[in-house]
């Protein structure tokens, strides 16, 4: 009997034994750094001379792994493999497919600290952030497995005399998964196993920044009994194979999480019908945000500061849900900023393999340079009240940074930075708080800190984001509890980790029989 879904608990690192276990996992992973990793096509491991070099962003002289790069010919072979695997995989019952995911979840759970340690090296995640990433991956495995078993039952329809109607789901066919680097296990896992448990083979092209941890997921699913050809691992340079994967006539869906620019490019290209294509491609896209926490005059100001600081600076602001803007009622504006600065001063910045580090590096030199440039923009547009320091001598470190007195239309109030930078702006009324909150092209997450029920009720419908939180931060959605996805240019509102997600990878079919 399968128990009801319940999210994976987070590790309490105040417990000495847990700290020791994580340190042991870090030591184990460190011994494995620098290895070569293959492509995986139809179960065959293929090593190439041309490789992605994955480095530790907190120690850029440390190579995490060398991952083989796929060519267009490899992509063709992977599609051939996926189409052949589809013939059998689609006929597996949902329960049998779900068992693969249950076994995979059990494998990861037994080795939880090991996977988290890989995230500390491959993605620069501090202990708690890495632990949460791994736990979320387990949640996706458990949640989607259960949900597919329910979906296989179909949906009830009305019947007429002498007529029977059935409504059920069938998989689409081979598709492409293009996940991000910031949740290098959780989102890679969720975006991959959702279409797989729905019956679709997948070509997985991981981020070039974090391909090693993605390969570890491939190993787990293979160990869990996933048939060859159902998951084909094809890392590579986006400029060389990205468009080719999206354009391919045999691509039935693209499951993408990443930047607005790449998401829009995928949308534009995927709508074009290629020679030999016999279907319309499904597009699932989560494309980032410019997320706002608003604070009215009735709010608990300590809670407001805590919500802003932890939402802005957790994992160095490298979350699409991160608080990048704080819009505060003018009567409490100065006090909220003062409390936020004092709290930010307590945050530790350092190597993520060390205990009690709150923030580590950002992911690479390009992102470091981008954030550094935005800090200079912020100095021109507002007043720097805390932070702004950067250091890329050993790793790509950016300290928590707070600006105040921004015009709501300023660049750092409108453009996604994806780093530890938060900008404060003031408003005279709740109407203006909402107007500013809604004045970007994004609509992913937001939060309202208020003790005014009327204001909270208004925000529920008028704050135009896919995930809205009251009296807490705007990050840390949990699978099955807060399905995740946004409005406007934040994406297709696919609600990952929710009851509607798997239908993106299924066709609904109706069969009517007359007696």
From Swiss-Prot:
Enzyme class: oxidoreductase
GO molecular function, one term: 1-pyrroline-5-carboxylate dehydrogenase activity
Residues at the catalytic site: 286, 320
GO CC terms of this entry: cytoplasmic side of plasma membrane
Reactions catalysed according to its record: L-glutamate 5-semialdehyde + NAD(+) + H2O = L-glutamate + NADH + 2 H(+)
Keywords: NAD, Oxidoreductase
Enzyme Commission numbers on file: 1.2.1.88
Keyword RNA-binding: no
InterPro entries: Ald_DH/histidinol_DH, Ald_DH_C, Ald_DH_CS_CYS, Ald_DH_CS_GLU, Ald_DH_N, Aldehyde_DH_dom, Proline_metab_enzyme, RocA
Gene3D superfamilies: Aldehyde Dehydrogenase, Chain A, domain 1 (3.40.605.10), Aldehyde Dehydrogenase, Chain A, domain 2 (3.40.309.10)
PROSITE patterns in UniProt: ALDEHYDE_DEHYDR_CYS (PS00070), ALDEHYDE_DEHYDR_GLU (PS00687)
Pathway: Amino-acid degradation; L-proline degradation into L-glutamate; L-glutamate from L-proline: step 2/2
CDD domains cross-referenced by the UniProt entry: ALDH_PutA-P5CDH-RocA
GO BP terms: glutamate biosynthetic process; proline catabolic process to glutamate
Keyword Metal-binding: no
Family the UniProt entry places it in: Belongs to the aldehyde dehydrogenase family. RocA subfamily.
Protein's UniProt name: 1-pyrroline-5-carboxylate dehydrogenase
Underlying gene: rocA
